[in-house]
Every structure is written in C-alpha cells, then in structure tokens.
Design a protein with these regions (language model features):
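Surface-exposed coil/turn segments at beta-strand junctions on protein surfaces, enriched
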Residues: 91, 189-193, 213
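Aromatic sugar-binding surface patches on proteins
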Residues: 161-185
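Bacterial N-terminal signal peptides
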Residues: 10-22
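N-terminal segment immediately downstream of the Sec signal-peptide cleavage site
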Residues: 24-73, 214-217, 222-230
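A glycine-anchored, Pro-Gly-centered beta-turn/N-cap motif
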Residues: 94, 192-199
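Extracellular-facing segments of soluble proteins and assemblies that are Gly/Ser/Thr-biased and enriched
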Residues: 72-163
C-alpha cells in the first residue's frame, strides 16, 4: 500500500454530493453517466481523512458508511494496490458503484513529482498503467456479474478537495484541479435483503519503469439491511 504523493492513487474498489442518478438498472448505468460518476467516486474517496478513510483501513460498518449520501452507495478500494477482506452494511434499496482497478492523476505543484498540468498531459502519463490492465473480474455470490455492469471508463476532468489529514501524506489541504481517472468500474442494482459476498479482482502490469505489477483483490461481506423510516 502506498499513501505518499506520487500523483497517482489506485483504488480497486474502494459522497458528500447529491447524485443525479436514482438507481442502477439490471443492465447497469447508461455509459454516458459513468465519466461523471467516476469523478464523484474520487471526490468521495479523497475527501475522507486518512485516519478513517476506508481506502486505507480495513473498514467495518464504522468506516464504510462515512460520507455516503444519496441512492448510490460507494465501495472503497485499497489505495496503492493490495488485498483486503471487508465487512459492510448497506441500506436496502441502494445501488452500488465501485472501481475494480483504476488510476487517478492530478495537477499539483504543491506536492511533486509533477506528472502533467493539462488534461492531455495527465491522461498521457497514466497510459502505461491502463494498457497493462488484465484479469478483471467481479463476482457476486460466486456468480460473474453481467458484462453491462462492468465497464472501462475514462472520467471527465474533475476537481477534488483534500483535508489536512489526507491519503497523500505529502499534499497540503487544498482543492486540486484538473484531475483525471481511467479504469474498470462496476455498478450493481439494489441487492436483496440479507448477506452477500462480493469479490473484486483486477491486475495491471505497466513495467518496471512505471508501477510494475499491481494486483487488486478485495472481498466484501455485505449485509443489506432494511431502512428505518421515522
């Protein structure tokens, strides 16, 4: 796991923003909505302090609920790569959205090394990682999910805010822009009430001059719970 500033963050699954999407259908989200939603996932993931960030710690219910809002529930990843076994309770009726393997790059002269300033430069830098992606899979209760629920996505350019205690230990609290992301993401319609096992796996071999061989492997033991209306 890496949480130093390298102008990247990999999150294999892993918002305080209202989402315009109601629910994920059985066929998945419309492809046109994914480039914006991937940016919103990063805004959620990077806004959470490192001490309680579910992308860094082994989250239980105390961390997987942090920052969640709206009808789509974000699942965290492992920043820098690695494996994790996690437990999380999800409100009934919520759709799920998460990366399988991805790479974010952003402009920040405050915490070098500088890997690009323009959107094109930032995208070009991450190409070796993206080209090396392989062995991508998502299973729910030991069954492969539909192909329409797992897609390669190139994000729209976005910005995000880092708190003082953030996942990039060398970066000061600030708003960073532009940022770009690319990788494989999955969306799941609301699950039935009760227990479910979700397994997410992805790999990238970008060579020794970039980031080497990265394996992302995360298992979620999910419990879908009824929502209490008061």
């Amino acid at each position: 796991m890496k949480n130093t500033r390298d102008f990247f963050a990999i999150a294999a699954i892993a918002i305080g923003l209202a989402l315009p999407i109601k629910v994920v259908s059985a066929q998945g989200l419309p492809p046109g909505q994914l480039p914006e939603l991937t940016g919103e996932w990063w805004q959620w993931a990077l806004s959470i302090p490192a001490s309680v960030n579910p992308n860094l710690v082994q989250p239980g219910d105390d961390t997987c609920m942090i920052g969640q809002r709206g009808p789509i529930w974000f699942l965290a990843g492992v920043i820098g790569g690695g494996s994790a076994m996690r437990t999380c309770s999800v409100p009934e009726g919520n759709s799920l959205f998460f990366p399988v393997i991805n790479y974010v790059n952003f402009y920040s002269p405050q915490c070098p090394p500088l890997t690009g300033k323009t959107v094109k430069e930032l995208r070009d830098y991450i190409k070796p990682f993206i080209k090396g992606i392989d062995n991508v899979s998502v299973t729910l209760d030991d069954q492969e999910i539909k192909k329409t629920l797992l897609r390669f996505v190139i994000s729209d350019p976005f910005e995000f805010a880092l708190p003082p205690d953030n996942v990039f230990s060398g970066c000061p609290a600030d708003i960073y822009s532009p940022a770009v992301d690319a990788g494989y993401y999955a969306s799941l319609p609301p699950l039935s009430r009760g227990a479910h096992m979700l397994h997410i796996h992805g790999e990238s071999d970008s060579g020794p001059n970039f980031f080497g061989h990265v394996v992302e492997d995360v298992t979620y033991n999910l419990t879908v719970v009824p929502v209490s209306l008061k």
